[in-house]
Amino acid sequence: MMEFVYPHTHLVAGVDEVGRGPLVGAVVTAAVILDPAKPIVGLNDSKKLSEKRRLALFDEIKEKALCWSLGRAEPHEIDELNILHATMLAMQRAVAGLSIVPEFVLIDGNRCPSLPMPSQAVVKGDSRVAEISAASILAKVTRDAEMATLDLAFPHYGFAQHKGYPTAVHLQKLQEHGATEHHRRSFGPVKRALGLASN
């Protein structure tokens, strides 16, 4: 993988999302501007880190970053817009929530939302760009905590384990118990569980 070449500017925000694939809950995004004077060791793609390491980095990022912000799109917005457009909206919200306006925004993936400043999509950015890695960690820890809370409210589904992704266990529980109000009704397995799918 080629080393990423940063844009010639100072205030660079990294943006990433977590939760495009799950059948339940919001898609959560984060935007982070790191402080060059306060480097954070060990930033890497959140999916490659242990949960313990993610939690430690979560606190360190919030403490050391120049600024950070979370964004989200709720299940009803995902159902209305589709998952791609809802993700773009959540990314826009994360960037808009930053207390410092970035001069440039780096987005994980291959597509950028419409933003009021220059931006660039970076494929595999969560493992190539520190700001995107930091955003990935903030988004994942936040969404995982939301799934743990949802698990307490709906203990039959196993949300704390599968985080809402369409695992065999989740699909089985969906058949047994039906969908919660937090499920994404536009997603095929949820439609089928609700009897809304057109065969």
Curated annotation (Swiss-Prot):
Cofactor(s) essential for the protein: Mn(2+); Mg(2+)
Cofactor note: Manganese or magnesium. Binds 1 divalent metal ion per monomer in the absence of substrate. May bind a second metal ion after substrate binding.
GO terms (BP aspect): DNA replication, removal of RNA primer; mismatch repair
Gene3D superfamilies: Ribonuclease H-like superfamily/Ribonuclease H (3.30.420.10)
UniProt-listed Enzyme Commission number(s): 3.1.26.4
Catalytic activity: Endonucleolytic cleavage to 5'-phosphomonoester
UniProt GO MF annotations: manganese ion binding; RNA binding; RNA-DNA hybrid ribonuclease activity
Primary subcellular site in the record, as a coarse category: cytoplasm
Disulphide bond pairs: none
Record bears the keyword Manganese: yes
GO terms under cellular component: cytoplasm; ribonuclease H2 complex
Residues annotated for a divalent metal cation binding in this entry: D16, E17, D108
Signal peptide positions on this chain: none
Keywords annotated in UniProt: Cytoplasm, Endonuclease, Hydrolase, Manganese, Metal-binding, Nuclease
Domain RNase H type-2 per the UniProt entry, residue ranges: 10-199
Intracellular or extracellular location(s): Cytoplasm
Keyword DNA damage on entry: no
Family statement: Belongs to the RNase HII family.
Described purpose of this protein according to its UniProt entry: Endonuclease that specifically degrades the RNA of RNA-DNA hybrids.
Protein's name according to its UniProt entry: Ribonuclease HII
